């Protein structure tokens, strides 16, 4: 399961840009959310690796 730590997320949107099928921005907030937590899309790992504050993880 892919999760985002919203305390750590800075809203840079890199995960959304890299993997829009798994991540989206929360309306009205500068935070990302996971729209497909059980996705196996390769880009999800790219987004995890690219997160500048390491807010995304797999559990």
Swiss-Prot record:
Key words of the record: 4Fe-4S, Electron transport, Iron, Iron-sulfur, Metal-binding, Transport
The protein's name in its UniProt record: Ferredoxin-1
Binding site for [4Fe-4S] cluster: 9, 12, 15, 51
Cofactor: record remark: Binds 1 [4Fe-4S] cluster.
Cofactor: [4Fe-4S] cluster
Bilayer-crossing regions: none
Molecular-function GO terms, alphabetical: 4 iron, 4 sulfur cluster binding; electron transfer activity; iron ion binding
SUPFAM superfamilies: 4Fe-4S ferredoxins (SSF54862)
Residues annotated as domain 4Fe-4S ferredoxin-type: 2-28
UniProt keyword Cytoplasm, yes or no: no
Biological source species: Desulfomicrobium norvegicum (strain DSM 1741 / NCIMB 8310)
Pfam families documented for this protein: Fer4_13
Signal peptide: none
Matching InterPro entries: 3Fe4S_ferredoxin, 4Fe4S_Fe-S-bd, 4Fe4S_Fe_S_CS, Fe-S_cluster_ET
Role, per record: Ferredoxins are iron-sulfur proteins that transfer electrons in a wide variety of metabolic reactions.
């Amino acid at each position: 399961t892919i999760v985002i730590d919203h305390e750590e997320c800075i809203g840079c949107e890199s995960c959304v840009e890299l993997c829009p099928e798994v991540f989206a921005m929360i309306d009205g907030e500068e935070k990302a959310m996971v729209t497909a937590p059980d996705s196996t899309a390769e880009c999800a790992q790219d987004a995890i690796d690219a997160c500048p504050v390491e807010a995304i993880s797999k559990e």
